[in-house]
């Protein structure tokens, strides 16, 4: 803690220093300094790593889930509908444990939006995450189209029956997924070690139910990629509006019921080992960001 404070104070002191007397006499400050500071503030050094992580995670998510769905659609004897749901839940679990400590493993534009709205994620990074997620999903879909040829439908999600039925289902199942996600990802009292398993199980359970009605997308990127590769856009708006409504309402609901426990002085409350590792990792990244910003300014 002392080390972090010293770095912060060092950065603050440096920003108040004036190394050229002419800047005071002329009433101006170096343009490059402000430009560099703005770039460092808005585009942190680790943003590229986060973006690449989201591309990879979303690619694998769509490749596995839509691949299983595409094969199942052509031959149910090879992969059942239950197998599709299990594959979707497992890949979400695996990716959370793989890159959750790097990018948060959003893999879903609606999830990123909800985190930003409720101040768990910086708005400035939202467009980069969206671009990464859609890029990963679209690339995975076209790779799948080439790999499982001659299957034409690459795991597309289309409504079965009236569109409003599918919309309601998408809102509810995405609500469930986001409610669980926000609980295990942001509440230190939750069992952090089971975060990936909890979210993956939520995806698996909801997709088992929703698969026969709406396809159980819960993810605009997961729908758009296969739609482009398969050239099927029936009810596409449902899979943008439904997940957004579901994630926002799910995040709002958990935020509303969340009990903010203020620890008493002298009490010892320990974080779970999983959350402690993530917290230390975030603190380390933040410290590295400060060091790199100071090096840029020097």
From Swiss-Prot:
Which is a GO BP term held by this UniProt record? silicic acid import across plasma membrane
The record's section on PROSITE patterns has: MIP
This protein's membrane topology, according to the annotation, is: Multi-pass membrane protein
Localization (cell): Cell membrane
- Where does the sequence pass through the membrane? 51-71, 85-105, 124-144, 166-186, 194-214, 237-257
The family database entries (Pfam families) matched by this protein are listed as: MIP (PF00230)
* Keyword Cell membrane (UniProt): yes
Instruction: Provide the induction entry.
Output: Regulated by silicon level; the expression being decreased 4-fold by continuous silicon supply for 3 days.
| Entry keyword Transmembrane helix | yes
Motif NPA 1: which residue numbers?
108-110
* Annotated tissue distribution: Mainly expressed in the roots. In roots, it localizes in the main and lateral roots, but not in root hairs. Within a root, it localizes on the plasma membrane of the distal side of both exodermis and endodermis, where casparian strips exist (at protein level). Expressed low levels in leaves and anthers.
What positions does the record give for the motif labelled NPA 2?
A: 219-221
Q: Which GO terms describe its molecular function?
A: channel activity; silicate transmembrane transporter activity
Q: Which domain of life is it from?
A: Eukaryota
* Cellular component GO terms, alphabetical: Casparian strip; membrane; plasma membrane
Positions of glycan attachment: 4, 13, 26
- What are the alphabetically sorted keywords of the record? Cell membrane, Glycoprotein, Membrane, Repeat, Transmembrane, Transmembrane helix, Transport
Similarity comment text for this entry? Belongs to the MIP/aquaporin (TC 1.A.8) family. NIP (TC 1.A.8.12) subfamily.
UniProt free text on domains: Aquaporins contain two tandem repeats each containing three membrane-spanning domains and a pore-forming loop with the signature motif Asn-Pro-Ala (NPA).
Role: Silicon influx transporter responsible for silicon transport from the external solution to the root cells. Is coupled with the silicon efflux transporter LSI2 in both exodermal and endodermal root cells for an efficient silicon transport across the cells into the stele. Silicon is beneficial to plant growth and helps plants to overcome abiotic and biotic stresses by preventing lodging (falling over) and increasing resistance to pests and diseases, as well as other stresses.
Q: What's the protein name?
A: Aquaporin NIP2-1
Species in which this protein is naturally found: Oryza sativa subsp. japonica
Encoding gene, per UniProt annotation: NIP2-1
